Amino acid sequence: MSSAQLRLVEKDSMDKQKALDAALSQIERAFGKGSIMKLGARENLVETEVISTGSLGLDIALGIGGLPKGRIVEIYGPESSGKTTLALHAIAQAQKAGGTCAFVDAEHALDPSYARKLGVNIDELLISQPDAGEQALEIADTLVRSGAIDVLVVDSVAALVPRAELEGEMGDSHVGLHARLMSQALRKLTGSISKSNCLVIFINQIRLKIGVMFGNPETTTGGNALKFYASVRLDIRRIGSIKDRDTVVGNQTRVKVVKNKMAPPFRVVEFDIMYGEGVSKVGELLDLGIQAGVVDKSGAWFSYDGTRIGQGRENAKTYLRNNPEMADAIEAKIRGNAGLVADAMMGTPEADGEASTPE
């Protein structure tokens, strides 16, 4: 390349840089400092803060160690599958870290004694039980904009009744009103959620579409807007019961990460939700320990580091509950082998995925 061509290239690049600097200074004068910047200039834009779900397996399945702050998360599933339990666990974890949490109880069904059993400090938890959907979302917007809230839970999207529907007759048709309400609210909320670094969890219910011959007839309420705005979507299902002799003492639960903008999606994790206790930590340590090669299972016997823990899963869980030092050691080794465990959780869109994922 000749010297004349080199000078031309340098002149072009200098002109481009000057034009860019002029554009950036004009934008900052018009909209304020910080309205535009290089992506790596702010650490909090690169490093995502997370809040644990209360489930070690689900934290690993999410790929980043928990639910991302400054983002929208949707948890949906059938009735009594553990949606509110999972949200309350996230609140408890945030409170342990010194955070302030709020719960918008549109269903008017939050049980304070159950929340306390899960580790929630109900004396510090802000709660609102609004009458109309507009009121609920306005309260949520005000709390998020304050910048003082770490976790905000809306339970549930299906219970956010538009005011026009409340004031109308029982048989009136309000086509698309709920979906429009959610779409408008999310357009307003999404910017302030990111700026305030608040985790907003929307709990949602599922419905069946009429006349679907092929594919999955299930859908979530509130239209399509939430599916687009959510960074993480969790499909939670009850897959069985846990019995102590003839008494049912808990549920076996499966969670699928249906959408994940932060890490690879479609990971599936199973854990126990015990009545009055929530997610069983010791049950997870056994299951994940086997996947990570930390806990050995031979027949009905569980053993760790050459020591027999117990015969049968429930006996092994009791042993770990009574020996917290061993439980902590197993947890540390599982966290050390998190990559191996995450690979074992990887599902596919087809296997219990797109075919069974509500649209």
From Swiss-Prot:
<dbReference type="GO" id="GO:0006281">
    <property type="term" value="P:DNA repair"/>
</dbReference>
<feature type="binding site">
    <location>
        <begin position="77"/>
        <end position="84"/>
    </location>
    <ligand>
        <name>ATP</name>
    </ligand>
</feature>
<dbReference type="GO" id="GO:0006310">
    <property type="term" value="P:DNA recombination"/>
</dbReference>
<dbReference type="InterPro" id="IPR023400">
    <property type="entry name" value="RecA_C_sf"/>
</dbReference>
<dbReference type="InterPro" id="IPR049261">
    <property type="entry name" value="RecA-like_C"/>
</dbReference>
<comment type="similarity">
    <text>Belongs to the RecA family.</text>
</comment>
<keyword id="KW-0234">DNA repair</keyword>
<dbReference type="InterPro" id="IPR003593">
    <property type="entry name" value="AAA+_ATPase"/>
</dbReference>
<keyword id="KW-0233">DNA recombination</keyword>
<dbReference type="GO" id="GO:0003697">
    <property type="term" value="F:single-stranded DNA binding"/>
</dbReference>
<keyword id="KW-0547">Nucleotide-binding</keyword>
<dbReference type="InterPro" id="IPR020588">
    <property type="entry name" value="RecA_ATP-bd"/>
</dbReference>
<dbReference type="GO" id="GO:0140664">
    <property type="term" value="F:ATP-dependent DNA damage sensor activity"/>
</dbReference>
<dbReference type="GO" id="GO:0016887">
    <property type="term" value="F:ATP hydrolysis activity"/>
</dbReference>
<dbReference type="Pfam" id="PF00154">
    <property type="entry name" value="RecA"/>
</dbReference>
<dbReference type="Pfam" id="PF21096">
    <property type="entry name" value="RecA_C"/>
</dbReference>
<keyword id="KW-0963">Cytoplasm</keyword>
<keyword id="KW-0067">ATP-binding</keyword>
<dbReference type="GO" id="GO:0009432">
    <property type="term" value="P:SOS response"/>
</dbReference>
<dbReference type="InterPro" id="IPR027417">
    <property type="entry name" value="P-loop_NTPase"/>
</dbReference>
<dbReference type="InterPro" id="IPR020584">
    <property type="entry name" value="DNA_recomb/repair_RecA_CS"/>
</dbReference>
<keyword id="KW-0742">SOS response</keyword>
<dbReference type="GO" id="GO:0005829">
    <property type="term" value="C:cytosol"/>
</dbReference>
<dbReference type="InterPro" id="IPR020587">
    <property type="entry name" value="RecA_monomer-monomer_interface"/>
</dbReference>
<dbReference type="GO" id="GO:0003684">
    <property type="term" value="F:damaged DNA binding"/>
</dbReference>
<dbReference type="InterPro" id="IPR049428">
    <property type="entry name" value="RecA-like_N"/>
</dbReference>
<keyword id="KW-0227">DNA damage</keyword>
<dbReference type="InterPro" id="IPR013765">
    <property type="entry name" value="DNA_recomb/repair_RecA"/>
</dbReference>
<comment type="function">
    <text>Can catalyze the hydrolysis of ATP in the presence of single-stranded DNA, the ATP-dependent uptake of single-stranded DNA by duplex DNA, and the ATP-dependent hybridization of homologous single-stranded DNAs. It interacts with LexA causing its activation and leading to its autocatalytic cleavage.</text>
</comment>
<dbReference type="GO" id="GO:0005524">
    <property type="term" value="F:ATP binding"/>
</dbReference>
<protein>
    <recommendedName>
        <fullName>Protein RecA</fullName>
    </recommendedName>
</protein>
<keyword id="KW-0238">DNA-binding</keyword>
